[in-house]
Amino acid sequence: MMANQGTLLEKGKADSVDTDSLEIDVESLTHMESQLNTDSKTRQFSVTAAINSIKISERTKLRAKIAVSVVLFASLFLFGKVDLSKSIEVALKANPWYLLAAFALFLGSTFLNAYRWKLLASAAGLNQSLLKMVQFCFVGVFFNLFLPSTVGGDFSRCYYLSKGTGKYAHAFYSVLADRTVGIAVLFLFASLGILLGPGGGGLPIQLKLPILLGTVGIFSVLPFLPSLAKRFLGPENWVSRQLNNSPASIYWHDRGLMATAIGLSVILQLIFVLCHVAVGLALGLTNIPLWYYFVFYPSVAVLGFITPSFNGIGIREWAYTYFLTLAGVDRAPALTYAIMWLGLTTMSSLVGGLVYVLGHFKISKAEKDLMESGRMDSLN
């Protein structure tokens, strides 16, 4: 019996030792895990700090954009075989009445654009008069061309709409929705031109494919984006929360609002197509079929929007020349067409400049610095 007790005692000691060892192992593992987490956070912080330390000044960004525009514009003459003297000759023979009509239509489109944006902003809880929204749009056009830093047209629209309200996020989402609806209709127009135009099938596949795929992607994914984000990213994901629980969610819930916005966008883009037709008629380019305007104008607009350049200058001239020569237009009048369109946008920007000065929309240096640093909420 004593032997059995001794055996049990020894077993108990062994179990005690094993338990102690287990506790030591758990503590060691916990310490190791903590150390690994600390090291991971340290490395993550170091990487983040390194990324944040890489800052490109606004002046450098602006110089880079100007350089891109200058190179693209100059390459038209160096490699595009464009005779500048012929382009000037075509410009001097332009019909001024058609150009005046194009300019009037272009200016008038700003009022419709402002009304569309007003509807989207009101849904997000930001109510301004139509006159104010028109002024904000004109000032935005001015900022796009003459102040092409981070304080661009869209930033300025967000700033003026939210000023004094503390609702910069609401303003941002309204501008983003305004942009998105416009781009969606641009893709739709280009696709309809390709599919329904008599010569759409003869266009290069490298032109047709991105337009058609982009249109399918926009109209098949965008309407269901919040639910798709929740399903694939999870409800707690930042993107899911922004789409489902932020002021932006109204644009998926109010289908009547978005149908109205899309309808206004269709009318707006039709006006821009008419502007392009008027410029073509002013230059005597009567051989361009109407359906083709629905293809090349949206394509040029999207390229000018996504390409890093000085307000799209350079890339637009290349694009206009490319698309018009595809339609059988000589290079010289094609370039003249591009320059005429640049002149239209520049004159509209000058009108925006008058609104900016006479409407007392000047931004102080302190406000400009905050906008460029991204601390927009501090402005309200």
Give residue spans per PLM region:
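Predominantly cytoplasmic-facing regulatory/coupling regions of multi-pass membrane proteins
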Residues: M2-F138, L196-F305, P333-A338, G343-N380
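Hydrophobic alpha-helical transmembrane segments of ABC transporter permease domains
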Residues: L176-L196
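Hydrophobic alpha-helical transmembrane segments in multi-pass integral membrane proteins
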Residues: P308-F310, T321-L342
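Transmembrane alpha-helix interface/packing and boundary motifs in multi-pass membrane proteins
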Residues: V141-S149, P298-E317
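Membrane-interface alpha-helices at helix entry/exit sites of multi-pass transporters
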Residues: L130-Q135, S149, G153-D154, G164-R179, ...
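Re-entrant/interfacial helical elements at transmembrane boundaries that shape
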Residues: G153-S162, S309-L326
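Hydrophobic alpha-helical membrane segments of integral membrane proteins
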Residues: S156-Y160, F172-V175, V185-F187, F310
